[in-house]
Every structure is written in structure tokens, then in C-alpha cells.
């Protein structure tokens, strides 16, 4: 599975804590992240992470492009809902794409834990079928 990991600045420590706690599960998958988040994950865990640009410099859009090509299976995005983000339209577009392409999305630690536990059980094997039908999702 291809998993995107994104965290706003005030949530990066939470992301590191999450990835560290679930490293045995995450290391079995292909990880992607926006720039700084990916760097922090690599430094803290040693996991291999494909890094895009930082979110405000287009990283969210790069992940969104993978979603639109049906090449991303899950997004874990620890958002900071209390701080205005200069790239909020990109964030909204990313969330919209997850809905359009039925990509599981967690925007907080509680939901992320549910997704990861489901991933561990094999609950997302259906994504392999969906990924094989590029362009056919939701009648597109």
C-alpha cells in the first residue's frame, strides 16, 4: 500500500509519535510525505520515505496528483484546525480528491489509529482492486 503522511507544523511532533508507535506496520508499506514531515520521520525512525515539496510549496498538490491517478491508497494528514494555513485551498483540494477517489483519509490521531489497525488486519485489500481500475472510479 502507498501511504501519504502529512502534518502541519504544530502537528509534526504528533506525526513522529504516531509513526514511531506504528513503525512495525508502516515499514511494510511504501511511504510518501511532504518535505519537512518526511525528513522528520526519516530522522526519527530511519524509515524510507519518498519526499515531495513542503506543503506550502506544492507538496499537498503532488500527493493530490497521485490520488487523482489512483496511485495513493491512504492519507494520514494531521491538520492544525486552529491555525490559518496559507495553502488552505490545496488542503481542501486534497481532502476533496480523497472523497472523489475513495481514498481512506485520517485528519487526526484517533482516526489514523483506526485506519492503521485496519491496515494491519488487511481491511484495505480492496484498494488493490480499485487501483487496477484507474480512471473508472466514481464513473470518471
Swiss-Prot record:
GO terms for cellular component: cytosol. Keywords: Lyase. InterPro entries: Methylgl_synth, Methylglyoxal_synth_AS, MGS-like_dom, MGS-like_dom_sf. It is an enzyme of class 4 (lyase). Disulfide bonds: none annotated. NCBIfam families: MGSA, PRK05234.1. Belongs to the methylglyoxal synthase family. HAMAP family: Methylglyoxal_synth. This is Methylglyoxal synthase. The gene is mgsA.
